[in-house]
Amino acid sequence: MGKRDRTEDDEVVTKKVKLDKKDKKEKKEKKDKKDKKDKKDKKDKKDKKEKKEKKEKKEKKEEVSDEEEVAEEKPKMTYTASANTIKSSGEYTQCDDLTNVSQSTIDNYFKEHTITIEGEQMRPTMEFSHVTLDPRITKVLTKFPRPTPIQAVSWPYLLAGKDMVGVAETGSGKTFTFAVPALEHVLSTSGGKGVRVLVVSPTRELAMQIYDNIKELCDVVGLHAVCVYGGVPKEQQRSDLKRASFVIATPGRLCDLIDEGSCDLSKVSYLVLDEADRMLEKGFEEDIKKIIGSTRPTGRQTVMFSATWPPEVRKLAEGFMKTPTKVMIGERDELAANKRITQSVEVLDPRAKEGRLLDLLRQYANDDFKILIFALYKKEATRVENTLTRRGYGVAAIHGDLSQQQRTKALDEFKKGEKNILLATDVAARGLDIPNVKLVINLTFPLTVEDYVHRIGRTGRAGKTGQAITLFTEHEKHLSGALINVLRGADQPVPDELLKFGGHTKKKEHGAYGAFFKDVDMTKKAKKITFD
């Protein structure tokens, strides 16, 4: 090897050494840079955590401050056995008249009306003399003989500012149950201008009905109420909201007004969810959560009413109510029909339904006899309405194809007796308080037995008796077992023709679909399935 070759080798080695040194240096710099970055990230994370903890501590402090402010605004309720006076401070105590009622009388009242209370026990205000309200409100109530069971049991809790869940049949006087304490709440506390009471309802018709009842009370005490629902222009509603203390609303329209900044609910301290189970059925859960989130987070009294008490309603209540008292009138955990309603089911050929309907109308229709007919589909309702009108019957109709103005007019005509027959789809099946409906006719059976119970609940309201006639065909035979259960549960006769479709059902639960019924032939043995 020559000198030149050795020199080249040395240069290569030297170059390699330099490259190695450079690589090591770059790696070291890279490592140092990474360590520095990790150290910075760690510090930032720590600072962020400390900042978050500081913020939470501050918010907690503000929350306590808010609660103290609310406590000053509305002192803590007290419960004694000496008086039932609603004082200007918002205090509730039990009156002497109620204290003097014997315990056996109270026990008999609970037994007679199948009343169950989960939570603190308070005596029911069975007579108007058992509760002292604003004289102007008392004057409105004098047109009624006495509080209904749900009112008698609920008023002590609601007047005391407690959260409450009420589970009772439709037509039990729920509106005044929450409206009377709501008025006392507003009158006895200082909250300034703005919406103080919010009632959320699943349908336009029910919202308007609640509004009509509440407006009567608001007018006598000088408070302003507004009804907010879809299907009509927003302009008037926006204007009315500016001076409203009470808002009765459907979820969809209310959320629209919240989004556009036309409805401020930050001062709402009395919140009512009426027909909570129906709102969940209609898919309003997210809207409800949004609405609740728009009200004041502390110092809010929350009231929920539901015709049934399924798991999804319980879960909703647990999410935003503070240890509510649960009041149940009747056996409500399982689907049950009002026992004051005489139910009869006729099994017939689908083509014979309209002929049978005409027979029933010839038998029952007169000027003093209000009849509510339920159809399943809008087109069916329109066709039957035209048929009955041609036959000379005075028929009003409400269904989804009609405008809000047309539906309101139809309901008014029926309520006032201008027309004695109301034809409806299930839009009117829940919550509507139509006085003195003597007969409900199910021309077409609904999609669920739950809807059947709510349909027939339009009669037999407020302690009165009623009648329901259902035309049942083989198209609905998959619901026969569940219907039989309802009939038997209400001590009603079950026709042999219905039993032929199948007399037993098993109630199943599915995570996605909820509770449903499956037809089962109990005479057959279960099949054993094996897999290879």
From Swiss-Prot:
Keywords for the protein's UniProt record, in alphabetical order: ATP-binding, Helicase, Hydrolase, Nucleotide-binding, Nucleus, Ribosome biogenesis, RNA-binding, rRNA processing
UniProt binding sites for ATP: 168-175
Catalytic activity, EC: 3.6.4.13
PROSITE patterns cross-referenced by the UniProt entry: DEAD_ATP_HELICASE, HELICASE_ATP_BIND_1, HELICASE_CTER, Q_MOTIF
Catalysed conversion reaction: ATP + H2O = ADP + phosphate + H(+)
Short motif DEAD box, span: 274-277
Domain (Helicase ATP-binding) ranges: 155-327
GO cellular component annotations of the record: nucleolus
Disulfide bond annotation, renumbered to this chain: none
Major subcellular location class: nucleus
An example molecular function term from Gene Ontology annotations: ATP binding
Biased composition (Basic residues): 15-58
Region named Disordered: 1-78
Cellular localization per UniProt: Nucleus, Nucleolus
Residue ranges of every copy of the Helicase C-terminal domain listed in the record: 356-502
Protein task: ATP-dependent RNA helicase required for 60S ribosomal subunit synthesis. Involved in efficient pre-rRNA processing, predominantly at site A3, which is necessary for the normal formation of 25S and 5.8S rRNAs.
Protein name per the record: ATP-dependent RNA helicase DBP3
Gene name as annotated: DBP3
